[in-house]
Amino acid sequence: MDEWIDYYDSTHTIYASKRHRDLHFQIIAKDIIGYIAAPDAVVLDYACGEALAAAKVADACSMLILAEPAPGVRGRLIARFAPNTKIRVRSLEELKNMAEKSIDLVVMNSVAQYMTPAELDSAFAVVRRLIKPAGRLVVGDILRPKVGMAIDVLALLRFAAKSGFMKDALYGLLSTALSEYRQLRTRLGLQRYSEKDMIAKLARAGFSASRARRNIGHNPWRMTFVARHAGAGEPGAAD
């Protein structure tokens, strides 16, 4: 995961335009809010990235913890949200020192594809310790086997056409094709899981999970899973 962390900590071209970037984070925030069960919930966004719309999520809960591995991004988060008393910024390492059973909802969105299977197992172990007995883990934007970059391109173009940044999207795709992102994706690859494999992986980590009806974010060809502590009842899902 380290090379991907370095990439996202750099001046990258993953977003086609400011409008694309802003809408991306707004949609994710809206989807996360859909999983918040009560206004007194404590929410953890694991490897949150720039989290530009995090204030909206914080408005829907009692506390939002933004955990981010990239030091540059983490510094910007601290500066951006310093006035917001409901938002805390932490490194992933700091999560290991947090109180057990202190979190109602953990969201890991668009993270698993950048981790090795062993790294993801370790992350599941860390967050499982933090989740309250009735809490939930939401693992979003999981890439499926045999669904390649062409589908990601189609999802982006559909999103752009609907949201009014098609010209920027086309230019952005050209830039991405020549960028370090494409080189990293070709060299390192992205981890992919079938529905069955992700549910089994979560089960081995001590969770009972099911696939949500819709994915977090704009890409309907990817998957989101909702998990609870094994034996805590059926996992719920947002619409």
Where do the PLM segments sit?
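Class I (Rossmann-like) S-adenosyl-L-methionine-dependent methyltransferase catalytic domain
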Residues: 1-37, 50-85, 89-96, 138-239
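Conserved class I S-adenosyl-L-methionine
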Residues: 40-49
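A short glycine-rich, Lys/Arg-flanked "PGG" loop and its adjoining helix->strand segment in the class I
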Residues: 121-133
